[in-house]
């Protein structure tokens, strides 16, 4: 089996179920008759561009990344510890004293669908144009956590 076929198989496994570790992926591949070293698997996962997401119970799992351009500057993700959404509003949690820095970054990005921000000491309220945009931004920001 060549690299492309192996990576296709990995993508199918990731789409079929929530897999949380490289060891789980390696075992599932082995069940299908594909033996890979940890180093090869690690390289494959990096090349595929998998994301580590958290499910509703807090368990981490791999997910295929979608090539979506983020409207936020790369520095924004550095400050976000947690993302919550209430309708068309996002609540971004930061370390103490960093919410205003994050607000300035988002305001400077001049994102058309962000109507405004309000910062506290460690919490930032981001008001989005509508709920769908808030959902998209929530997913985008949460993917970087």
From Swiss-Prot:
Top-level taxon in the UniProt lineage: Bacteria
GO molecular function: arginine binding; DNA binding; DNA-binding transcription factor activity
Signal peptide boundaries: none
Keywords of the record: Amino-acid biosynthesis, Arginine biosynthesis, Cytoplasm, DNA-binding, Repressor, Transcription, Transcription regulation
Gene3D superfamilies reported for this sequence: 3.30.1360.40, Winged helix-like DNA-binding domain superfamily/Winged helix DNA-binding domain (1.10.10.10)
Pathway(s) it belongs to: Amino-acid biosynthesis; L-arginine biosynthesis [regulation]
Keyword Transcription part of the UniProt annotation: yes
Record-linked Pfam families: Arg_repressor, Arg_repressor_C
GO biological process: L-arginine biosynthetic process; protein complex oligomerization; regulation of arginine biosynthetic process
UniProt key word Lipid metabolism: no
UniProt GO cellular component terms: cytoplasm
SUPFAM superfamilies xrefs: C-terminal domain of arginine repressor, Winged helix' DNA-binding domain
Subcellular location field: Cytoplasm
Role description: Regulates arginine biosynthesis genes.
UniProt xrefs under HAMAP family: Arg_repressor
Protein family according to the UniProt entry: Belongs to the ArgR family.
Protein name as annotated: Arginine repressor
